[in-house]
Amino acid sequence: TPKVPIEVLATADEEGAICQRGYFGGRYMTGNMTVDEYLSFRNIDGKNITDLQEECGLFKDVEFGCDNGWAKGYYSRFYEVHVEQGGVLEAAGKDIGIVKGVVGIGRLFIDFFGESDHAGPTVMSVRKDSMVAAADFIMKAWEVGQANSGKAVTTVGRIQNSPNIHNVIPGKTSIVLDFRSEEDALANEIKETMKQYAYSMKEKYGVGVEITQEIYTPVKLFA
């Protein structure tokens, strides 16, 4: 029998994969999210949290409210048990590790605009291919990540291409760059480097470029 009460909970969307903002559950618990902010969240398809909850059959009759969060001192300790994701412990032959903090996490949402034409008669010299520009950007992101290996990581894990037909030159390609680092300064350097590189696609490929959203959650080191 434990000497003190123990509560077990699961937090939601801590990396912002759905709502584009991180620490969704954690911010709820600590009162660092207002009701208005909660209701303003949209996923990449434009759906808000209440829409998604209803689709999943969750919290239909629950009134949302977290302006005050849990009272300070309500819990004396908080422990998060997390599965090993990167394979570092396994490679080192260790069973468990203790993290020293949370890395800074940033995202750039980028649209490349080209001109959709038929893939057959449109000669290469006049093409404005949004996918080619996006592919170039993705390779640059890979190179920047490799150059900062051990200190930062870069990933493009989402691509939306239009019209996405095999015999049509892409007219619009949207991607999301995810970048992370233990150093805020390095994360900012990567962000600025990739923004400049994105805009350089205009002259290189004759495409339009728009960065529609920038998100960054700073590094948090534990005491």
Annotate the PLM regions.
Residues T1-P5:
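Flexible, small-residue-rich helix->loop connector segments that border functional cores
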Residues E7-L9, E210:
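A structural signal for isolated positions on well-ordered beta-strands in alpha/beta enzyme cores
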Residues D13-D184, Y199:
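Midchain, well-structured core segments that form catalytic/ion-binding scaffolds
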Residues Y38, T193-M194, I215:
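Active/binding-pocket-proximal capping segment
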Residues T122-S125, E189, L221-F222:
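Short, solvent-exposed loop/turn segments at secondary-structure boundaries
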Residues G150-V156, Y205-T212:
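Short beta-strand elements
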Residues E189-Y199:
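Short amphipathic alpha-helices in soluble, non-transmembrane regions
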Residues E210-A223:
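An extended, acidic, His-containing surface patch that forms the Zn2+-binding/catalytic region
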